[in-house]
Amino acid sequence: MNNSITEVNMSVPSRATNSNNTILSEERTCHRSQMASSDAVGRTMALLPINHNHALHHGIKLMPHINMPHREVGATTPLVTNSGTASTCSMSLPGSMSSASDTVCNILPHNTSDSSSIDLASLFECPVCMDYALPPIMQCQSGHIVCASCRSKLSSCPTCRGNLDNIRNLAMEKLASSVLFPCKYSTSGCPETFHYTSKSEHEAACEYRPYDCPCPGASCKWLGELEQVMPHLVHHHKSITTLQGEDIVFLATDISLPGAVDWVMMQSCFGHSFMLVLEKQERVPDQIFFALVQLIGTRKQADQFVYRLELNGHRRRLTWEACPRSIHDGVQSAIAVSDCLVFDSNTAHSFAENGNLGINVTISQVSPSIS
């Protein structure tokens, strides 16, 4: 088979006929805290630090190519896990295409109204996954196209069973530059459309994309809608503690544990749930701690709040204040740019009492919450 790229100008095809060391799985790294609320003043709850390896249908129109106050205390209890071992804790807690001319034809809508515009994007639908085949667009000898992702897994054309040669469909590539494609999450509510060159960038940060399990370092591969995040945590990560109120104490125990460790707690206030994370990483020549707050919500909702972390004791005070991050962004994105409270092990021990580190957490609402 000749592997060289053959450039073939194809006429615009007819419309296609085809239109989810540590505790593994869910119990793994989220044995860090208990998903139970506590209203008792001064009540102590156990949180578990975890050792780990550290982890359309959419109408499309042709573009200009055409001629047209009280602190509740939550205490953490470490779960020591060696690499490779699992430990537990007694916590209750497109159809056929013609191969004709070298010219891309202008496709005109039947009329100028939006409702009657031609769904050009559907011409690019992959017959396998129904996503869009975007430039460079490859075709079989009969002119059928398939997206790059599916093509790498196929040995023959899914439409005609012919050979999948390295033939580019230049006509479709030219047409693609004149089409606005809907976001892949349009069925989830995203109304945006994009030129194919900016489609992937948007989708990587789209507010309508599925949410990952927010537990840091967890092996949990769960994906779901925002409304399903808290039920998922309640039923599958039952060891995460939830404290009520806008002003609490997050107590991390045994901060001297070796290796990478996470402490996690939930805080409920203002009708929202926030995830408090303290992560320790092994970095030469010292251990580094990262503390931050995430909102179980969208980025727009997160902008309505400010959180304050404070280490206080031994005539010292260390404070960090910022807007919480949405769980869509994740813990690691904040750590990567140090958008969190960062301190070394010497600082941690200077504020610790008997190996336990208390962090005062205050959440404030800066403007009315957006649902």
Curated annotation (Swiss-Prot):
Binding site for Zn(2+) 2: 213, 220, 232, 237
Family matches, as SUPFAM superfamilies: RING/U-box, TRAF domain-like
Tissues expressing this chain: Widely expressed. Colocalizes with SmRXR1 and SmRXR2 in vitelline cells.
Top-level taxon: Eukaryota
EC number(s) stated in the UniProt entry for this protein: 2.3.2.27
Main enzyme class: transferase
Pathway the protein contributes to: Protein modification; protein ubiquitination
GO MF, one example: ubiquitin conjugating enzyme binding
Catalyzed reaction equations: S-ubiquitinyl-[E2 ubiquitin-conjugating enzyme]-L-cysteine + [acceptor protein]-L-lysine = [E2 ubiquitin-conjugating enzyme]-L-cysteine + N(6)-ubiquitinyl-[acceptor protein]-L-lysine
Annotated binding of Zn(2+) 1, by residue: 183, 190, 202, 206
UniProt record similarity statement: Belongs to the SINA (Seven in absentia) family.
Domains as described in the record: The RING-type zinc finger domain is essential for ubiquitin ligase activity.
Record protein name field: E3 ubiquitin-protein ligase sina
Lineage: Eukaryota, Metazoa, Spiralia, Lophotrochozoa, Platyhelminthes
Gene behind the chain: SINA
